[in-house]
Amino acid sequence: MEKATQPRAFYGSFFHAPAYGSFEYLERALIEVGEDGAIERVIAHDDPDQAAALAKAREAGTLYELGEGRFGLPGFVDIHIHSPQWPQAALALDEPLYRWLDERTFPLESKFADVDFAKKVYSDLVDQLLARGSTTAMYLGRAHLEATVALAEICAERGQRALVGKTVMDDPAANPDYYRDASPAQAVRDTETLIREVEAIGRKSRAGAWPVITPRFIPSCTDEVLRGLGNLAESTGAYVQTHCNEGQWEHDVVLERFGKTDPYALRDFGLLREHSIMAHCPYLTEEEGEMFAELGVAVAHCPTANSYFSSAVAPVQRFRSQGIHVGLGTDISGGYSPSMYENIRQAVLVSRLLETGVNAQLPPEERGGLGEGTRLSLVESFWLATAGGAEALGLPLATFEPGRAFDLQVIDVKRPDSDLTGFGVFDEPIDRLARILYLSTPDNVRQVFSQGVLVCDKDAR
């Protein structure tokens, strides 16, 4: 698709959330995009320059018009995905975590030693994510180097911006013999190789690709490998991702092993730093949160997966008030859906439960709710899925502002089987946005652009 002539001016009505807690509706705006896929200018409909700019783009054949009944949203930024778990999405989520891992996840992930199998799965996963508007994705590949490099190549070929890590899990006492790193030294060497190869892919990728240092989580790793990965993070400045304070079991294991909690252990191994993305974190204390903010550590909030396997809700509003960067993750396949729309909805839902508590057999004051100021609004959740994820990654994207990468999903609200028009009732911009975020199906997402290039076109099918 990149070889075809690409639009350089996009005319229509757009929603975005450039600031936490608010959104902007850019009605009949013209967005001009440079050859590099970055936004150059946003011209409002009442700007006297718009008519001339529209005419110029139309004459040059570079104008794209969204059309009636269509709206533009920024591409989503999904900052926590287990790429090899895609074949088990939606499976065994009613089982305990240990059974889900031992009987499903580890046997499945071990199959990715077969690179042909890995490419088949990863190609479908990336296509499915793009079809749902996710133009940026942060992946945990698995313990196989070649398959993980192949994932980065597939993302680059399809136009998805990707941050890719080879998961490290080397402790013989904690991981199955058939699926673990051969040694701490080999795990670090493989991660060094991954960094070189993904950086090379990124230099050729229009949207970009970045390597990520990825210990699975502390219980699966030896001290030696955690120390080695921390040193590698220091020397390379690469992104870091892992699970942190995900559940009570993890918390207890780390505390018994080190005499300190998960965040402090990760810090002492050199794995908490700017561009570290910590997934889940519902058990993060206020003191630990202050440390995150001071170090520039970000949280990947995974509301669906937390409900299944953390038995807790992350206090996102507290994180934000402490100055912690927070984005949103689907957490395939601890989260069943590849859709960020679903996780936007779930983030709002679980925050309401955190606000009030859930045991109706107890008096309200004893239900464990955190009270007023805990709930997320839909607009705040939309921000988490777009600008919040971009902020967590430190990348200029996910809003319609000059200098930002132009990532666009075109939403058709008049699809025959998914009509979001609302019959002309409650038709303010916030109502239109709410219908899009709550009711959209993949069929409503008609076209997706990444870095200014068309990467998904359902209208052409």
Predicted regions and their residues:
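N-terminal metal-binding scaffold of metallo-dependent hydrolase/deaminase domains
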Residues: 1-61
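Active-site gating loops and adjacent loop-to-helix segments of metal-dependent hydrolytic enzymes
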Residues: 87-120, 171-185, 248-273, 298, ...
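C-terminal cap of metal-dependent C-N hydrolases
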Residues: 19, 405-460
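Metal-coordinating catalytic core of metallo-dependent amide/deamination hydrolases
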Residues: 146, 151-282, 287
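Glycine-centered positions in the ABC transporter ATPase nucleotide-binding domain
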Residues: 13, 36-37, 69, 448, ...
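His/Asp/Glu-enriched, well-ordered alpha-helical/loop segment
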Residues: 268-275, 317-420
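Alpha-helical scaffold segments that flank or form the walls of functional sites
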Residues: 70, 89-160, 190-205
